[in-house]
């Protein structure tokens, strides 16, 4: 589920079905580069309706800290640390997708950090959390639960292909704030370091395969070099 910035107007429609990035092949890694259509149901192929390169206006601006929300809902469970970040399995209702840079909380609404990367398969994905300065990755327990403001979630259908014959504005770009810069690429692994079907994440920092959203400004997944 490697989202690259660039372009206007939402999410790229390459060949293949249901992928989230540009790469080719049908194994379920998030890797940049490559040619051809991605395999169905992963977060990297240039699939129709995936989280491709398209950024676009009107969605995912950089969050500003505004204190805890009125209520929080379950976002995911702690899997393992990765450098100074943590990797979590997403367990949201109906597989909703968190905005990039959305604040992540404990059940008591204490903020621990922000969503940094999202990766894995379409209906079985993971996310990493960039921890706040006062938080340590080693302080969390396996399967510890984390929470999010329900208004910082998007329906998975936003990123799926539109049924044949359905009319309406293109899916993807959407309105509303949220998001911000994307992740960095670089070997997160879904539920375990490295590759594998659980959502391996390939590509160096900022390379082919990282969420490359722009830093603030203009909304959308911004292009390279921002």
Curated annotation (Swiss-Prot):
Subcellular localization(s) per the UniProt record: Nucleus, Nucleolus; Nucleus, Cajal body
Pfam families xrefs: Gar1
One annotated GO molecular function: box H/ACA snoRNA binding
Top-level lineage group: Eukaryota
Stretches for region RGG-box 2: 171-226
InterPro entries to which the protein is assigned, alphabetical: Gar1/Naf1_Cbf5-bd_sf (IPR038664), H/ACA_rnp_Gar1/Naf1 (IPR007504), Transl_B-barrel_sf (IPR009000)
Region spans: Disordered: 1-66, 158-226
Main subcellular location: nucleus
Keywords annotated in UniProt: Isopeptide bond, Nucleus, Repeat, Ribonucleoprotein, Ribosome biogenesis, RNA-binding, rRNA processing, Ubl conjugation
GO BP, sorted A to Z: snoRNA guided rRNA pseudouridine synthesis; telomere maintenance via telomerase
Cross-link Glycyl lysine isopeptide (Lys-Gly) (interchain with G-Cter in SUMO2) placement: 136
One annotated Gene Ontology cellular component of this protein: telomerase holoenzyme complex
Annotated spans, RGG-box 1: 4-59
Compositional bias ranges of the Gly residues kind: 1-59, 170-226
Alphabetized Gene3D superfamilies for the sequence: Probable tRNA pseudouridine synthase domain
Family of this protein: Belongs to the GAR1 family.
Subunit structure as annotated in this protein's UniProt entry: Part of the H/ACA small nucleolar ribonucleoprotein (H/ACA snoRNP) complex, which contains NHP2/NOLA2, GAR1/NOLA1, NOP10/NOLA3, and DKC1/NOLA4, which is presumed to be the catalytic subunit. The complex contains a stable core formed by binding of one or two NOP10-DKC1 heterodimers to NHP2; GAR1 subsequently binds to this core via DKC1. The complex binds a box H/ACA small nucleolar RNA (snoRNA), which may target the specific site of modification within the RNA substrate. The complex also interacts with TERC, which contains a 3'-terminal domain related to the box H/ACA snoRNAs.
Function statement: Required for ribosome biogenesis and telomere maintenance. Part of the H/ACA small nucleolar ribonucleoprotein (H/ACA snoRNP) complex, which catalyzes pseudouridylation of rRNA. This involves the isomerization of uridine such that the ribose is subsequently attached to C5, instead of the normal N1. Each rRNA can contain up to 100 pseudouridine ('psi') residues, which may serve to stabilize the conformation of rRNAs. May also be required for correct processing or intranuclear trafficking of TERC, the RNA component of the telomerase reverse transcriptase (TERT) holoenzyme.
Domain-level remarks: Interaction with SMN1 requires at least one of the RGG-box regions.
The protein, known as: H/ACA ribonucleoprotein complex subunit 1
Source organism (scientific name): Rattus norvegicus
Lineage, opening ranks: Eukaryota, Metazoa, Chordata, Craniata, Vertebrata
Recorded name of the encoding gene: Gar1
